[in-house]
């Protein structure tokens, strides 16, 4: 019969738990061990009878036993090599037709379930859905942590405002603070009035001094070549600015006189060209209201 293939050897190794060749090696080692015990016993017996008359033949006995041991080893190796070939080719071998038919089921394959492609795809889809759910949970957790941080900051701000408000409400012994508190009552109406006034100022500023209107005016002045009109535009913007500052109480009498003075025409023309008016942010008032 032919020599065992790699498929046959691998299946037998997995089934037995050790390579098939190790079984033959164990047999040869056991025979060699018995042979060594025999030669050792023979040498011991001959050495006990080594003296014949006055002559001692101990060295000759040791040399002869060693040669006998070598001959026995060669004989064992030669004959058990034949045994090894026979066992591997005829005993520890699985025929190819059985390997091709897949008739073997090992111990670890008894509960093995063969899954078809449809079930495999369903399992992959379920696994993918679980992974997406886990990722979504991580994202929600991250968003919640950010919101918790914002809420903690807001809570800290509210506590500080509450502390300041309590200090303001407890100012019964301070006459000056009592007068200020009385002048602000009712506080809700005062805050509403301030926000309405600020909104009106923003709307007026956008309708009269927006960036688009100023740029359109400068373009018209450059096209027509009427540089004198720049003085009127500058004075107009100064008057509107002074009115706004005066309503807010931020402009004194001396500052009013300085702002109403006529500047040099060249300075006015240079300033108008470099005017950079920012757009009013009306959404800031929405947060206040």
UniProtKB/Swiss-Prot annotation:
Keywords: Cell cycle, Cell division, Centromere, Chromosome, Coiled coil, Cytoplasm, Cytoskeleton, Kinetochore, Mitosis. Its main location: nucleus. The keyword Transmembrane helix does not apply. One of its GO terms (biological process) is kinetochore assembly. Pfam families: Mis12 (PF05859). It comes from the Eukaryota. Component of the MIND kinetochore complex, which is composed of at least MTW1, NNF1, NSL1 and DSN1. Acts as an essential component of the kinetochore MIND complex, which is required for the spindle checkpoint and kinetochore integrity. MIND plays a role in establishing a bipolar spindle-kinetochore interaction by joining kinetochore subunits contacting DNA to those contacting microtubules. Belongs to the mis12 family. Present with 2610 molecules/cell in log phase SD medium. This is Kinetochore-associated protein MTW1. It comes from Saccharomyces cerevisiae (strain ATCC 204508 / S288c) (Baker's yeast).
């Amino acid at each position: 019969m032919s020599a065992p293939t790699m498929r046959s050897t691998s299946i037998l190794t997995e089934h037995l738990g050790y390579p098939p060749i190790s079984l033959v090696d164990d047999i040869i080692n056991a025979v060699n061990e018995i042979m060594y015990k025999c030669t050792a016993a023979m040498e011991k017996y001959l050495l006990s009878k080594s003296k014949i008359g006055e002559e001692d033949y101990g060295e000759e006995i040791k040399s002869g036993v060693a040669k006998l041991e070598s001959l026995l080893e060669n004989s064992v190796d030669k004959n058990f090599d034949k045994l090894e070939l026979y066992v591997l080719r005829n005993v520890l071998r699985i025929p190819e037709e059985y390997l091709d038919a897949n008739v073997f089921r090992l111990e670890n394959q008894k509960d093995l379930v063969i899954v078809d492609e449809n079930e495999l795809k369903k399992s992959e889809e379920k696994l993918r859905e679980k992974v997406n759910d886990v990722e979504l949970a991580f994202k929600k957790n991250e968003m919640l942590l950010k919101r918790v941080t914002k809420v903690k900051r807001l809570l800290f701000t509210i506590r500080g405002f509450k502390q300041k408000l309590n200090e303001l409400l407890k100012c019964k012994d301070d006459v000056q603070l009592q007068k200020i508190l009385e002048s602000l009552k009712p506080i809700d109406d005062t805050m509403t009035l301030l926000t309405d006034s600020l909104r009106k100022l923003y709307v007026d500023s956008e309708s009269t001094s927006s960036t688009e209107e100023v740029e359109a005016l400068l373009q018209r002045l450059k096209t027509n070549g009427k540089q004198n009109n720049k003085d009127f535009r500058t004075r107009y913007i100064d008057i509107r600015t002074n009115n706004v500052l005066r309503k807010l109480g931020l402009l004194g009498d001396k500052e009013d006189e300085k702002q109403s003075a006529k500047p040099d025409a060249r300075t006015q023309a240079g300033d108008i060209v470099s005017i950079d008016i920012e757009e009013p942010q009306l959404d800031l008032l929405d947060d206040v209201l």
